[in-house]
C-alpha cells in the first residue's frame, strides 16, 4: 500500500523540467501533423493542374465544318500556362513545406505572398476560360456570334472538363492561402489593449 502511494505521489509531483519536456513533445507532435497535412494539401493541386493542362492540350477537333484547337484562343492558352506554373509551384512548395526546419517570418511571408499570387493567377485563368466557353456554348446574338459547340461538341466537352478541374484547383489554392495567412499572422503578437484609465483627454478651456 505504501509502495502504491509512493508511485502515485511520484507521478503527481512531476518536476517543472519534466512538465516542460512533455509540453515540448506535444507541441512537436502537433507541428509534425500540421506539416504533413500542409504537404498533402500542397501536393493535391499538382494532379489537378496537370490533368486540366493535359485535357486542354488534347482539346482539338476537325470535321466537315472546319477545325478548332485550344491554341486558337488566347484564354485557353493562358489556362495551359497558368496550370503549368501552378503545378510546378505546388510541387516545389510541397517539398519545402515537408522539410523539418523551423518556420521563420521571412519564410512565412514568402509562402503567404506566393500563395496569394498563384491563387489569383489560376482564378483568372478559370474565369476568362469560362467566359469564352460560355460564348462557345451559347453564342452572342448582339455580335451575331453563333454557337460553336453544336458543331464541335467533343472539343467543348474536353474544354469544359479542363475548366471544371481548374476551379477545383482554385479551391485548393484558396485553402492554401488561408493556411499560409494563419501561419504568418500567428507569428505576430496581438496589439496590447490600452486601459481606458491610461488615456488622457485633453482639457479645452470653456
Swiss-Prot record:
The keyword Cell membrane applies. The keyword Transmembrane helix applies. The chain crosses the membrane at residues 37-57, 79-99, 108-128, 159-179. Residues 1-36, 100-107, 180-206 are cytoplasmic. It holds the Pfam family CASP_dom. Keywords: Cell membrane, Membrane, Transmembrane, Transmembrane helix. It is found in: Cell membrane. It is a multi-pass membrane protein. GO terms for cellular component: plasma membrane. Residues 58-78, 129-158 are extracellular. Homodimer and heterodimers. Belongs to the Casparian strip membrane proteins (CASP) family. This is CASP-like protein 2A2.
